[in-house]
Amino acid sequence: MSIESKAYHLIQPGEFEYTTINHEFRDGDVIVNPSKASVCHADLRYYTGNRRKEALDKKLPMALFHEGIGTIEDSKHPDYQKGDKVVIVPNIPSRLRAGDFEETDLLDNYDENAVFMGSGYDGICQDRMVVPGDNIVKIPDTLDEDVALLAELCSVSLFPINQLKEITTKSSPQVAVFGDGPVGYLAATALHYIYGIEIENLIVFGAIEEKLQSFENFATTHLVFDYDFNSHKGVHTVFECCGGKFSESAINQAIDLIDRQGQIVLMGVTEDLVGINTRDVLEKGLTLSGSSRSTKHEFEQLIASFENEEYQQALKKLIPDEYYDIHSTEDLKKAMDDTAAHKGWKKTYLRYHWS
């Protein structure tokens, strides 16, 4: 069975086009009507053209956005029914896709034949999405849907924490986060509210004092400019959440800071090559690992964890005071232009009105 969806395609940086998309609706699938989406920096990189030309040529035209919620219009999956409010899990592994793909023992977010919404595969900027039923998670009636809309962003920070065998040790009881933006904030909140890392053992380094003040209810904070990283003892794990032009300095400060046989998790995205102090990586016996995206497990874990009122209050600092109401390509362009021009700390939320 085929269904038609209205969509806004990004056809080139800065330009959207209203179009229609056809989807096959198969057994095990659900039709979701996206109601709200949240803008990610990855979306902005496509919109502003801040991606390599070959990536833009390969992936556009495309419907943006991978952070979204919606309501089920129809279901061929036994666990979901019409009217359910759901969070959309954007990574569709090959085992859930139509087609003949080689089996893999890789995690879903590292499956080479997976597709990811808003990254070479049409995302949440459409009125009807057909997704596997295993790619959604129900939103409880008691949960604020604006908090639920943060699930994807939270999941990206939670996934690498879940992968670690141990976050701390007896002799190195501390965890550090580099980055005072949303990714660092969500990594720190997960470490405190889900994993129970206490304030005195959770250290956040940043460059802007006003941003660091938002962390002070659950973490110890320091500015990077005047901190003596080499003299600090007690950190076993560091999460690098800076990205961009700050990746190199953050990684090397983390190498200076961390105890021997510690672990550094790289989460910040940069388009540039960075120089790393490999001599001290070797001398200290450090482990560096990368992390990208997440799995459905993190979404389920988060929806359950969002029941914690203190966690909810911490997350609400990222929720904007107003939505952008999207009736047309002009509305969408304004929302993206504003977001690109004013890269504030709070998220940009879009509310769809399809005619």
What kind of region is each of these model predictions?
Residues 24-37, 52-98, 140-142:
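Glycine-rich beta-strand-centered segment in the early N-terminal region that forms part
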Residues 2-3, 227, 252, 296-355:
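C-terminal hydrophobic helical "lid"/dimerization subdomain
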